[in-house]
Amino acid sequence: FDAQIRLAGEGTLKWVLADAEGVTAASGEAEAGESASISARLESVRTWTAETPYLYTLTLSMEQNGAVSHQVSCRLGFRRVEVKGNVFTVNGKAGLINGVNHHDYSPEGGRTVALEVMRQDVLLMKQHNINAIRFSHYPSIEAIYDFCDEYGMYVIDEADLECHGFEWAHVYDMITDDPSWENAYVDRAVRMVERDYNHPSIIMWSLGNESCFGVNFKKEAEAVRAMDSSRLIHYEGDFEAEITDVYSTMYSRLKGLKEIGETKMKHNRPHIHCEYSHAMGNGPGCLADYQKLYRTYDRLQGGFIWEWYDHGIKTTDENGTVTYKYGGNYGDFPTNGNFCIDGLLMPDRTPSPGLVEYKQVICPVWMERLGEMGDLFAVKNYYDFKTLDGIYLECAVTDGKETFETFTIDSLHTEPGVEEILTIPHSAVDWKDNRDYYLNISVREKKETAWAPAGHELGHYQFPLPEKKTVSVKREELPVSVSETATEVSISCQDVVYSFDKVHGVLSSMKKGGQELVKRGPVLTVDRADIDNDMYKVNDWKNNYFISRGMEELEYMTVSSGQNKAQVYIQKHFGCYNQAWGFKLAYVYTIYGDGSMETELHGTAIRNPEFEPEFLPRIGVEMNVNGAFRQVAWYGMGPGENYCDSRQAAVMGVYETDVDGMHTDYVMPQENGHRENVRWVSLTDEKEGLLITSRGGVGMNVHDYTTEALRSAAHPCEIKKQDDIVLNLDWKHSGLGSNSCGQEQTEERKVRIEDFAMSFALSFTEREKAEERAFTVFC
């Protein structure tokens, strides 16, 4: 241990270094002057890491004539950061950064942020498994570094240096490579190092952000190294890793990142992804893909999501409605619009679906079943310094709603970086017919920590169980009657009536006892409300391919009936304005005497490869349901919204909410609330309503507004609600990606123009019997 101390005044300097329990580890004194050097050799110390943040306190006292004239103290940590081969290490171990970029921001105070809010930021990060912060793009207030030291966060501290605007003027290196600016560059880094040097959480000094590269950065790096050789130097703008200790990139696509991991490019330096997965609006997708690369290639040592917080300005109107405003809302122009609304945390400090997903993706305890349906599971400890002694597994056997067995596994001792094989058996259960069963495992903290209570969940996993029994029952044979006019076909069974529009070839009504359940039948749609991450696709979709103007055209319709069922066959063509691509559609509706209707839709793609969109937002159907049915229950992935490239945090289950609960309140309204793999959904009032079942599973959205209403709104308060409920059932729904700045949807998660088939059934249900009816299989 050693320290250099600047002094003013006369007297004797006395110092004490105490551990976290207050026990003196070392002490001494020195005569005061302009400066003093103190040092001590400690036989052993408890080291500091983000996982095990242990702090000592150094107290300095100036004494004159036996009395203390001045006293200060600061907390210190012991840790070593160095590069070994193509990885950087903390205390000798290569670590993985699961980080976020952080701006100082408050929706009420702007750049003025309360200390308690800063503390809550760090606590919330820890609770979501985040272990690192890049302060972008300037040093933050001093207190937050204390919180990072205390709770355990790795920090990249960044100099307040950015001259990105020169890039747009095509003279990017104008001042960066001009020696007359050397002092300005060096000064900003030196001030940062001098102020923040004593914080153990800081493992890298960043020379700045997006300022090209030139002689002034070389001088800046020299100055920083002269002051502090114990930390690494970072600067993404050093594209060749000429002066930095790590090779840093931003918004690298998955393919490019994999290439970095597989090669020794850029001097084989450790790689840091200083910005990635731009969290603007609905997203980011592909987080699990990035994490898989980080956990596969040693050289790829993780990165920092852009960014932590949505920068909306809070306003409240005379009615008490809160709106978060962004660029252009005050008549300012030019503007970047809502490009500042790009965080994992919403302006009201609600974790976004993206943050919930990120927490699961970076969970430090990973689990996988070995074999298709066995009892053997692999558990890997992705901590760098902690064993799993402090973790327990809370296990439950469930059908998605009812829990049949619970038990706890609390004997894990897995060492850091090690994989262990566990046997997790379960007892025999009186399985219900036609149900799916799962083993749900929640990974939890045994004891209270500084940042979370005992029992805090780090992550969760779900594994299907093999005990499903399929038992069918014979459908009750009841009469069906068909009546027809010049414009309509009506099919009646009991007191349920299905009406089909013969002019447009569409289900125009489903009624039960005179009450309308469905007001507009399924029609094909390939559109979704624009998401920020599709911003480079939207113009193409809207103005070149007119996907929001898709429509069906009837070719012909036939009706056949027997004593106990009737069938309506409708052949149609789907296309968009002035387009040669589309689908040939065949709807087959089978109506049974018990009042239920099975719907099959077969689509044959009409291709025109030279003049068709690369991919579509979705392929599915849309229906209008009676607006009185606002209670929503479903069996599928949940509880929150999930998409094909953002569903690690979702598990299969039976969930209940209302139509408002199916909406995610993004600052800039956009596609939201989707659920994947939905096997059934009921829309009811307090007593009864509509049940939709799909054995193969569909994607689902339920809202009280149209796609166009969502697309037209600039803020949530501007969304024009309607009486009807809009129900979307999707064959496929494209992923999210993060292409507002970065990776677009991966190829396998783009909905192509291709043949498809989907099926689902509609029926009336009493609310309390919806689940029972949904799991009934008829023959």
Regions found by a protein language model. Name each.
Residues D2-A8, L376-D384, A761:
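Short edge beta-strand/loop segments characteristic of extracellular beta-sandwich folds
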Residues A3-K84, D430-D433, Y437-E484:
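Extended acidic/polar, glycine-enriched regions
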Residues I5-T12, Y383-I391, A580, P609-F615:
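A short beta-turn/strand-edge loop motif at beta-sheet boundaries
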Residues E29-A36, S411-E419, K750-I753:
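Short proline/glycine- and polar residue-rich coil/turn motifs
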Residues R46, L55, S69-A132, S140, ...:
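An acidic-aromatic substrate-binding cleft motif
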Residues T49, P425-N434, T449, A454, ...:
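Beta-strand/loop-rich accessory regions of lumenal/periplasmic or secreted enzymes
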Residues A67-A378, Y382-D389, E394-E402:
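Extended substrate-binding grooves/exosites of carbohydrate-active enzymes
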Residues Y294-G505, T599, K769-R773:
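Carbohydrate-binding surfaces of carbohydrate-active enzymes
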